A protein has these predicted regions:
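Cation-handling catalytic/transport regions enriched in His/Asp/Glu
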Residues: 1-214
Length: 214
């Protein structure tokens, strides 16, 4: 569990940073769209010159493993097992659930990853994110069934770390300025949705509960 004071401090810090985070970015995006103010429904619209480069599954695998290995070879070695032993269900097909997750099962077995890979840069990030969970789950397995499970705050730290390792490697390997702008914009929007939007939800729900108490 996360203490209430910690949650309140986090929420306040993010809210105080709204002008420097979401407000600043959306003003910039409005300029890219030739608008004075960005419309609400255009917040997540692709940039005008976004052709969304496609990656093969093998390219995505190599990018993630190389990014992991550059940080720590053991991290890459563990992630490699997910490919070699077919612990990843990535192919889209009719009737398959959407979304993505890494299920830890039990420590005596191994995790399974579900995702839908369409070759977009965001799919590469999803693969890196879920493998971050998977590596974490493998490493926590020796703690046993009662101690290996982790709260979301800890689990998401591992997954976002793996995702950011891969993103930085992808960005450093991209030489086209327009493509670099698209990658950075996509990552900023992902982080706004993961952090700023969630805090906005939190503030709304807190107000609803406070009003209900009155």
């Amino acid at each position: 569990q996360v203490e209430d004071d910690v949650v309140d401090a986090l929420a306040s810090s993010v809210k105080d940073a709204y002008p420097d985070l979401s407000h600043r970015y959306y003003k910039l995006k409005a300029k890219w769209f030739g608008q004075e103010q960005l419309e609400y429904w255009d917040r997540n619209a692709p940039l005008p010159d976004d052709s969304d480069k496609r990656y093969s599954w093998d390219e995505a695998r190599s990018m993630v493993l190389e990014a992991y290995g550059a940080f720590e070879p053991q991290m890459s070695d563990i992630a490699q097992r997910f490919f070699d032993e077919r612990w990843i269900d990535a192919g889209p097909r009719p009737g398959k659930d959407s979304g993505a997750f890494s299920h830890p099962t039990v420590p005596s077995a191994h995790p399974y990853i579900l995702m839908n890979f369409h070759g977009k840069s965001r799919d590469v990030m999803t693969l890196a994110h879920e493998l971050g969970h998977g590596v974490h789950q493998i490493l926590s397995g020796p703690q046993g069934a009662l101690m290996s499970d982790t709260p979301l705050t800890t689990a998401e730290t591992a997954s976002v770390f793996g995702e950011m390792l891969t993103f930085r490697a992808m960005l450093e390997g991209e030489t086209d300025p327009a493509r670099r702008k698209i990658l950075l914009a996509g990552k900023v929007e992902d982080m706004l949705k993961s952090v700023v939007r969630q805090i906005a939800f939190h503030h709304f729900e807190t107000k609803v509960h406070d009003e209900r108490k009155v």
